[in-house]
Amino acid sequence: MKNRILLINLGGPRDTSEIEKFLIDLFEDPLVFDLPLPEWIRKPLGKWVAKKRAPKVAQTYKSMGFGGGSPLVSETSKQANAIAKALEKITGEKWEGNITMTCGYPDIRKLNRDFLVPTKQNILLPLYPHFSRSTVLSTAKLVEQTTKFCPVSYEGWVAPFHSSQVYLESIRDLILDFFQNRLNRKDFLHSDSFQGVSNWETIDLIFSAHGIPIRLIEKGDRYREEINSNVENLKRLLYEKGFRGKCHTSFQSRVGPSKWTEPNTITMLEQLGKNGVKRVAVYPISFVSDHLETLEEIGEQLKKIAYNNGIAEYHRIPAPGIYPKFIEAMAKIGLESIQSSKNECICKKLGGHFPNLKSGECPINF
């Protein structure tokens, strides 16, 4: 059997024709579109919301300059190839990099079972640094539908990696390389504006994460806790390298009227401007590749809000993508997942209350 690593991401439409499929997969997922409704109401409602949002979303994707779609799938493919090469360099063996998406194409539901069974020679890497029911648990459940067993207790399954030292150091170095204009622009999208940051040691740094509904936190989701821990660790590493600016944590991409994790990044920028802050850099801490939420939301929408609130200097730090130190970190984290067997179902430890669970049952089925 050949060595393989499978990168799993949420997904994004590659062109206009895939937008509706992407949104339907997103809003039909009970762990993403998590509402206190009977399934016979929730699922059709999710499909209706997807169809209603599709035209507006299409206009946003059209403005990004990627043929009416998202670059996320192609960027993930670049990461898979780069990580496979890094694994070959570390192990001296041949590795094959593959990708699949939980929403849209390539569809995880259509993938051959052999690719979804985690083993020492078949690493499954969900590209989420932090746990959330709507990402990691949703991914595990989709894998289980094909394999017929919960994958997270098996060697070869990569758990959320926000606390990994090699990951943390790679993100610290990415931020510092951006500040000091040392990034290879060919490795990043929309990089023409990368000019470095003068007096970077004192700029205000916002770690902006994708928000989630508070109802998920109330169910035991550890996402917010892990974001905060990630920020604290990065602050420590940055301060050790001479950074002295203030660090802030906020959440973006809210959808709908329900209460989400706070503070919202919009509110954060408004407050910083009100307080007289003139220089801000934003890093997308919950994302590992650039796409709609980083290029359009952080790069354009939030920049306008910053300028409208008196902030004179605004920088979008890119997601890691194929940044070499990040790629090497992901390869090492992947190998760590096969070096010791967990031999237990760890779904409960990943967060979430499951009141209907019987003793010994895996919550992935709920």
UniProtKB/Swiss-Prot annotation:
GO terms for biological process: heme biosynthetic process. Pathway: Porphyrin-containing compound metabolism; protoheme biosynthesis; protoheme from protoporphyrin-IX: step 1/1. One of its GO terms (molecular function) is metal ion binding. InterPro entries: Ferrochelatase, Ferrochelatase_AS, Ferrochelatase_C, Ferrochelatase_N. Its EC number is 4.98.1.1. It is found in: Cytoplasm. Keywords: Cytoplasm, Heme biosynthesis, Iron, Lyase, Metal-binding, Porphyrin biosynthesis. It catalyses: heme b + 2 H(+) = protoporphyrin IX + Fe(2+). Pfam families: Ferrochelatase. Fe cation binds at residues 210, 293. One of its GO terms (cellular component) is cytoplasm. The keyword Lyase applies. NCBIfam families: hemH. Belongs to the ferrochelatase family. Catalyzes the ferrous insertion into protoporphyrin IX. This is Ferrochelatase. It comes from Leptospira borgpetersenii serovar Hardjo-bovis (strain L550).
